Amino acid sequence: MVNLSPTVGAEITKTRPCVIVSSNEIGILPLKVIAPITDYKPRYNTVPWMVELSPDGINNLTKRSVVDLFQLRSVSQGRLIKNTGKVGKDEFQRILEATKIVFGIY
């Protein structure tokens, strides 16, 4: 869970689960690059930067969700509240592919 408030404009807000996408190898900065998780909506099936996650015992989500890679941001480690789960290798690979789409890296 990550506290994403306060925000400005269309930034995603409130305390919510997120996927940390930055590498631990960069450990010198007190920041993490995160992608927030939000509720699934059928219209997201055609949005290339939304990666669907189904709830399971590894990610510990309680409902069908999506990782919103268009809302990538760096946050202070002080915003990280607790670790609630992980994504699997296949899911993380899909997240990395969606990140490439956001940055135009094909």
Regions found by a protein language model. Give the residues of each.
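Hydrophobic alpha-helical segments
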Residues: 6, 15, 95-96
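GIY-YIG nuclease catalytic motif and its immediate N-terminal context
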Residues: 1-10
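Compact nucleic-acid interaction/catalytic patches
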Residues: 10-15, 20-55
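Short, conserved beta-strand segments within well-ordered enzyme catalytic domains
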Residues: 1, 33, 68
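C-terminal terminal-subdomain/extension
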Residues: 56-106
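Short, flexible segments with low predicted structural confidence
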Residues: 5-6, 40, 66-67
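Detector for Asparagine
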Residues: 3, 24, 45, 59-60, ...
